[in-house]
């Protein structure tokens, strides 16, 4: 019999308990499926369950555990998947009515990899339409709840992914991040979110938004979980996080744009977190970086044309089926000139190189994950201008990491719905995770 506290254990802790024979994967999956069915918001979190698949995979995991043939720490651990990862024979609809009834024949490559590692697919979680909003509101399918405010949105676009973990309905979630879609819902639901470097993990079988920026990443209860699942998706050993310390680590607080129009609670929560990092031995510097400001200015020229080009043909067949603010945002990309788009990419490449030169020698650049708290869902529905303003504000800080091609880790600060982000150089995830686990410990210290 699986007790309630087990449902909120980290994925890594569950894996160790399975290895020790303390938890049976079949009983664990049955407990998660029962909890999802019984939860009053279960259908707002999960678009659909893969019940038969989950039970089959759990029985196979149980057999491997009994035979001493487990494939890794996550063997037998139940995960949720955002509804833009293809799942063979099960609908993958990307949060939009325009893809209703779309059933792929093959699993996404990353789902195949985690299945080979023994992880169990519980089902597909709700998301914002086409993954094109950071708020988590989706009036077309469902808007999952926020763990800290039942009237607020949960953050997006990996909204159901974060809710599935926060409400104890999955041990870990796999989401995607194009402009903040892993980190924002992680922050607003007091979880850990990892944005991986673009190109690090394969996108085969993942519904695209802006392919040059699309990334796969986990939302989890711990940094260790993020390290374990990233390693499993790459079929390699996880980095050794033991002994990580902040002593002597150099952090740069990114001033300027990340603090414009920041709300009081995120501002205070961030500064309290910085104080804790300093108390744990981190050396804190502060600076505004021209490369960041200039890269952000290019965002509308680069993002919106790429997103609109990706989905224009489908959207324009039935635009009335798309939530108006999402439709307007897509269409804002149709009037940019090709020469401006190309020139913007050339400039962005220069800004990326300049940023890396400006931040060389720092272990991480830190900033508030989001400058605001989760907005009220009803107001967002009723006031489309408010939706647009809050969406752009919500995504501003996280988009910095995407524009500059970085890997980024968002950690809970201890203040509800306030996250702190640590940014590191491209492909430096293992270093970031080692720094992150030490920061995680410092932030959890009273």
Per-range role (PLM):
Residues 1-56, 279-282, 445-446:
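An N-terminal boundary/leader segment
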Residues 21, 32, 76, 116, ...:
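Glycine-rich, small-residue loops and helix-cap segments
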Residues 38, 116, 167-259, 271-280, ...:
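Structural helix-boundary/capping segments
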Residues 32, 54, 226, 251, ...:
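Residue-level signal for inorganic ion chemistry
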Residues 74-213, 256, 367-387, 417:
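Short glycine/serine-rich loop/turn segments
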Residues 22-30, 59, 265-288, 312-317, ...:
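Acyltransferase
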Residues 74-94, 248-250, 302-353, 368, ...:
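Short helix-loop capping/hinge segments that flank enzyme active sites or metal/cofactor-binding pockets
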């Amino acid at each position: 019999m699986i007790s309630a506290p087990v449902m909120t254990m980290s994925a890594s802790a569950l894996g160790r308990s399975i290895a020790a024979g303390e938890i049976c994967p079949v009983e664990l999956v049955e407990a998660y499926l029962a909890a999802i069915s019984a939860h009053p918001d279960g259908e707002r979190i999960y678009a659909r369950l893969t019940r038969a698949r989950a039970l089959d995979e759990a029985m196979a995991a149980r057999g491997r555990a009994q035979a001493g043939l487990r494939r890794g720490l996550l063997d037998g651990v139940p995960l949720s998947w955002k509804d833009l990862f293809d799942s063979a024979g099960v609908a993958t609809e990307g949060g939009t009515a325009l893809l209703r009834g779309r059933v792929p024949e093959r699993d996404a490559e990353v789902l195949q990899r985690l299945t080979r590692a023994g992880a169990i697919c519980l089902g597909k979680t709700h998301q914002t339409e086409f993954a094109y909003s950071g708020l988590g509101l989706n009036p077309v399918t469902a808007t999952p709840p926020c763990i800290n405010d039942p009237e607020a949105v949960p953050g997006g676009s990996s909204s159901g992914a974060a809710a599935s973990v926060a409400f104890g309905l999955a041990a870990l979630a796999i989401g995607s991040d194009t402009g903040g879609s892993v980190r924002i819902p992680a922050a607003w639901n007091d979880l850990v979110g990892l944005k991986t470097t673009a190109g690090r993990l394969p996108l085969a079988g993942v519904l695209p938004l802006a392919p040059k920026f699309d990334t796969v990443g986990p939302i989890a209860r711990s940094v260790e979980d993020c390290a374990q699942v990233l390693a499993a998706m790459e079929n390699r050993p996880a980095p050794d996080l033991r002994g990580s310390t902040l002593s002597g680590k150099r952090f740069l607080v990114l001033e300027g744009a990340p603090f414009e129009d920041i709300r009081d609670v995120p501002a205070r929560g961030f500064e309290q977190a910085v104080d804790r990092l300093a108390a744990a031995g981190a050396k804190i510097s502060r600076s505004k970086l021209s490369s960041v400001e200039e890269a952000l200015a290019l965002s509308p020229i680069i993002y919106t044309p790429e997103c609109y080009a990706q989905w224009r043909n489908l959207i324009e067949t039935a635009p009335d089926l798309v939530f108006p603010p999402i439709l307007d945002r897509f269409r804002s990309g149709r009037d940019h000139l090709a020469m401006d788009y190309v020139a913007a990419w050339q400039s962005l490449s220069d800004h990326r190189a300049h940023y890396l030169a400006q931040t060389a020698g720092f272990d991480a650049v830190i900033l508030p994950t989001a400058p605001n708290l989760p907005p009220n869902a009803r107001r967002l529905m009723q006031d489309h201008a408010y939706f647009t303003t809050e969406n752009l504000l919500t995504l501003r800080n996280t988009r910095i990491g995407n524009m500059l091609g970085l890997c980024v880790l968002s950690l809970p600060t201890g203040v509800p719905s306030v996250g702190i982000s640590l940014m590191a150089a491209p492909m430096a995830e293992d270093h970031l995770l080692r720094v992150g686990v030490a920061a995680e410990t410092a932030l959890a210290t009273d």
